[in-house]
């Protein structure tokens, strides 16, 4: 079967929007999804370091348009996107855990739960107790997940994506 790669980071509202629709698109097109958790901060560091300056000194008009555009797309996708109190969030452990979820066959449920926790419930998903709760919600053992995300194999896989 044909497949396509879907790169995403829980800390990105734009990948949350795409995630909310990707499974339906794949089903309609008869393709499989090759899930690729990434750290979008690493991508920014490689291709657009100015993003940090733009965040530190935002232009008010651009910010208003950005928020409006994001909310328009969220309504279109049928999801809620709020303004998390911690943004950007340090999502490295969460994205490593996404690889554990991929191996366990529950990555879509894990990611859906994590996206909603951060963007819908506005929780600080960088905190260990939040990661543990997300794991429990999707049937992953939190202690086992924490052990795996500390290992070199998972770290290397996330860097490779």
Language-model regions, residue ranges each:
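C-terminal cap of thioredoxin/glutaredoxin-like
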Residues: 2-5, 10-32, 99, 104-106, ...
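Structural alpha/beta surface segment adjacent to cysteine/selenocysteine redox centers
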Residues: 18-118
């Amino acid at each position: 079967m044909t497949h396509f790669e879907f790169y995403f980071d829980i800390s990105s509202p734009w990948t949350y929007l795409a995630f909310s629709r990707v499974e339906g698109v794949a089903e309609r097109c008869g393709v499989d999804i090759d899930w690729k958790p990434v750290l979008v901060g690493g991508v920014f560091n490689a291709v657009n370091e100015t993003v940090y300056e733009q965040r530190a000194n935002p232009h008010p008009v651009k910010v208003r348009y950005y928020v409006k555009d994001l909310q328009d797309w969220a309504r279109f996708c049928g999801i809620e996107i709020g303004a998390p109190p911690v943004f950007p969030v340090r999502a490295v452990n969460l994205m490593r855990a996404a690889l554990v979820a991929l191996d366990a066959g529950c990555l879509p449920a894990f990611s859906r739960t994590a996206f909603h926790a951060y963007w819908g419930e506005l929780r600080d998903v960088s905190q260990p107790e939040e990661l543990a709760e997300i794991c429990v919600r999707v049937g992953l053992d939190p202690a086992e997940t924490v052990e795996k995300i500390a290992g070199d194999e998972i770290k290397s896989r996330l860097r490779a994506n």
